[in-house]
Amino acid sequence: MRKIMIVDDNYLSAEGIEKNIDWEVLNAEIVHICYNGTSAIDAMKKEPVDLIISDIEMPDLDGISMSRQALDINPMVKIILISAYDKFEYARRALLLGALDYIEKPLDYAYLIQKVKNAFALMERCLLY
């Protein structure tokens, strides 16, 4: 079963991702829900995850910086960054640092599910080689 971490300083956004996706059907489970980047890094050190779904704009440690640290801890972790801001610069920075994908809010859960499936498929391909 794949392990997922959700990181968003907006409780309703994090809860929406948790509740609007049938994780069991995807053979995945939410193991961490964090509300800032620092707690996400701490949680990841305690229990590694396969996929991080994170907001970009957060106090303390933003999603870009958190992603950079997460990839330092586990270079194989896949990251999908989300943002309410449609700034190309965010997407560019996210992809340059190694994030798998960038999605704008408001979230289309069907689209997010497809991106999660793509991440899982990539993980499977990496295991084959």
Residue ranges with predicted function:
Residues 25-31:
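A generic structural motif
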Residues 3, 30, 78:
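Residues at the starts of beta-strands that form the adenosine-phosphate
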Residues 2-13, 17-18, 52:
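Conserved acidic segment of CheY-like receiver
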Residues 31-38:
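Conserved Asp/Asn-Gly motif in the active-site loop of CheY-like receiver
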Residues 41-129:
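CheY-like receiver
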